[in-house]
């Protein structure tokens, strides 16, 4: 059985890569064969004309993959902007078919494939110039891949609105949602919002909370895996 998830977030910088890394390490600790993709990465480091995707490189390391970065991150852009804007500036096509070729290749190799998106659901990826106003968004990519979603959200003020809006946008496209994970991308403030938001979200949404990831001070493989197993509903994640 080939299975997997699409990891998206309520916004840019919410911690999708860290959460994806945590799930990867927990699956590996359970003895599962798991791979990862960062389908598009902007803000890549240009080293002697070669674009290096830091998120894609981290995921390859966390998953202990020996696959090419061209498979793990098939679209790499230098400017830290939305793919649509960055690709126009750099005059590089965001080739959706290229993403799917890489996706299908990796799916055949792994029992589970974790696919991390870019930004939030409504980040534009490209536009078919022959079709008036025909934009292709992250949400369309998720729909076409057919993977259930794990939503990464924040514990901080504003997360209730962002989480509900994102879940509503997924529902409108009839995209399956496995659940959400609350990620502390910064040290806990222990304010009222952080203390109350997790429970309020549980009351408001009809998909389960799969865990709360505390702030990680270091990206140590063993530490991330242990933290994930301790804080995530691993059995629910493994069971599609």
Swiss-Prot record:
**Which co-factors does it depend on?**
Mg(2+)
* Keyword annotations: ATP-binding, Biotin biosynthesis, Cytoplasm, Ligase, Magnesium, Metal-binding, Nucleotide-binding
InterPro entries attached to this UniProt entry = DTB_synth_BioD, P-loop_NTPase
A Pfam family cross-referenced in the UniProt record is AAA_26
Report the domain of life of the source organism.
Bacteria
Q: Name one GO cellular component term.
A: cytosol
Residues that, per the record, bind Mg(2+): 17, 55, 116
Chain positions recorded as substrate binding sites:
42
Q: In which pathway does it act?
A: Cofactor biosynthesis; biotin biosynthesis; biotin from 7,8-diaminononanoate: step 1/2
Q: How does it assemble?
A: Homodimer.
Q: What is this protein called?
A: ATP-dependent dethiobiotin synthetase BioD
